[in-house]
């Protein structure tokens, strides 16, 4: 009986020894797994794997890179990661000069396109905004003339009401800037209405409008110039228009003043000649009367 008992006991002890070995192996494997998890969650990631790597001619790695064997480690250490980032910093964070130039050119081109499109939309918005403010200021007494191309200067006109029996003052103004102030407090001359008009020759239109207003006020007869009226009209033109249009208004006003000065001089000379001729006629008549008495 000693042999069967010895065999069974030997078998039992061998089983216990095998189970103990399995437990130790499992414990060491779990420790290795926890160690790999602490050092890196992806130990086999190609970005940090240096095992059996072949360096090509274009790689930037140093020749002194450590080559790890299969039994040395399963994951990259923190020092390996730092070395990798340090050696490849330029390739990761710095663009090449050519790429920078191309990127800058694309950014500049896109910016120019946005600015050009925004300028066009701003011009349209300025036109619409100014038209609405013009209509709110002058109410329903607004007549719109056929619109010219957008590159032409835009004008406004104050003209006599339709069907008027007598000539009424008319007034033109231009506007080219988006910075227009509210004109709700402006008082127009009597029997004048505001009319929006477009023109490509603002100075000539201003001058013609001033001439029409003077003729409607003074009539076709030759008489002295009403300078108070001219001053009132000038300030009215300036108040109605933007500052960039003032140069056209002043140029037209100067041209009109020169013409009116010449006209006034002619009227004065004619009156002086008429007075001289009348005095001479009286002197001749007096002499004849004296001679007849004698």
UniProtKB/Swiss-Prot annotation:
Keyword check for Transmembrane helix: no
Q: What is one Pfam family matched by this protein?
A: Ovate
What name does the UniProt record give this protein? Transcription repressor OFP14
Statement: the UniProt record of this protein carries the keyword ATP-binding? no
Q: Which residues form the OVATE domain?
A: 195-259
Keywords linked to the UniProt accession: Nucleus, Repressor, Transcription, Transcription regulation
What are the subcellular locations of this protein? Nucleus
List the top taxonomic levels of the source.
Answer: Eukaryota, Viridiplantae, Streptophyta, Embryophyta, Tracheophyta
Ranges annotated as biased composition (Basic and acidic residues) = 61-72, 96-117
GO BP annotations, alphabetical order: negative regulation of DNA-templated transcription
Q: Which cysteines are joined by disulfide bonds?
A: none
- Residue spans of biased composition, Basic residues class: 49-60
The record's section on NCBIfam families has: A_thal_3678
**Tissue-wise, where is it found?**
Expressed in roots, rosette and cauline leaves, shoots, stems, flower buds and siliques.
> Which residue ranges does the record annotate as region Disordered?
49-72, 96-129, 141-185
- Quaternary form? Interacts with KNAT2 and KNAT3.
> Which segments show compositional bias classed as Low complexity?
164-185
Q: Which domain of life is it from?
A: Eukaryota
Q: Where is the composition biased (Acidic residues)?
A: 118-128
Q: Which GO terms describe its cellular component?
A: nucleus
Which miscellaneous remark does the UniProt record hold?
Plants over-expressing OFP14 have no visible phenotype.
Organism whose genome encodes this protein: Arabidopsis thaliana (Mouse-ear cress)
The role this protein plays is: Transcriptional repressor that may regulate multiple aspects of plant growth and development through the regulation of BEL1-LIKE (BLH) and KNOX TALE (KNAT) homeodomain transcription factors.
